Amino acid sequence: ERVLELARKFPKIGIRISIEGLSQKNDELRGRAGGFDKGLRTLLSLREMGVKDIGFGITVSNNNSEDMLSLYRLSKALNMEFATAAFHNSYYFHKDDNVITNRDTVCGNFAELINMQMREKHPKSWARAFFNMGLINYIEGNRRMLPCEAGLMNCFIDPYGEVYPCNGLEAK
């Protein structure tokens, strides 16, 4: 409801609802039953309100890279945006490191996503494909291809309303 309220005040806002896969996988990883359905309902309500820049955001981990591809296809079927991030320590994930242990699988799924994005007719999708190439690079233990602009160009607001430069940093 707070997201819808925000969109009423700022109808030109861009909103990505963080979903970690399809229903079962999302709810398992988030530890909350019905989370996927709530997120999808929120996106559909935003669309009904006339908000145009809406879509899914997924943080890819050891456990959900295959669902990333299904969620991407769903976003395309619904004509919504799709954003990705690589797994990192944050409020939501219960792990002490940022290591992806099944790199080949995760990187292979990212490569498939990149191929789908490159077949689109939108330069924005091509830019996202480049970003995802950078995520493969990051997962393989290499340096970032793009500089981090956390806190300068974006921020993260946790479920308690605390503002962070990004969802992977501890400092407020």
Segments predicted by a language model, with ranges:
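Acidic helix N-cap motif at the loop->helix transition within catalytic regions
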Residues: 2
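Radical SAM enzyme [4Fe-4S]-AdoMet core and its adjacent flexible, acidic
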Residues: 5-20, 24-164, 168-171
